[in-house]
Amino acid sequence: MGAALSQGALIAIICNGLVGFLLLLLWVILCWACHSRSANIDSLSESSPNSSPGPCPEKAPPPQKPSHEGSYLLQP
């Protein structure tokens, strides 16, 4: 029975390793595709400045929340 447990553990470790490796590979491919596409868009944007930013736009700044500090100054 000990051999069956170690074999099951070995299979689980191998499967988890394969899944982790495939996820890492997918992440690398997506990042590479995103960077290469943004580089192509950057080179195209020099000739056409009105082009869209594409699927990987730069991070926009967070929207400004209305500040309630000093709002009493606006009231009469």
UniProtKB/Swiss-Prot annotation:
GO CC, one annotated term: extracellular region
Annotated region described as Disordered, given as residue ranges: 41-76
Compositionally biased tracts (Pro residues): 52-65
Signal peptide: 1-33
Alphabetically ordered keywords of this record: Secreted, Signal
InterPro entries linked: Adropin
Principal location listed in the UniProt entry: secreted
Protein localization: Secreted
Organism classification: Eukaryota, Metazoa, Chordata, Craniata, Vertebrata
GO biological process, one term: positive regulation of Notch signaling pathway
Protein name: Adropin
Biological function: Involved in the regulation of glucose homeostasis and lipid metabolism.
GO molecular function: hormone activity
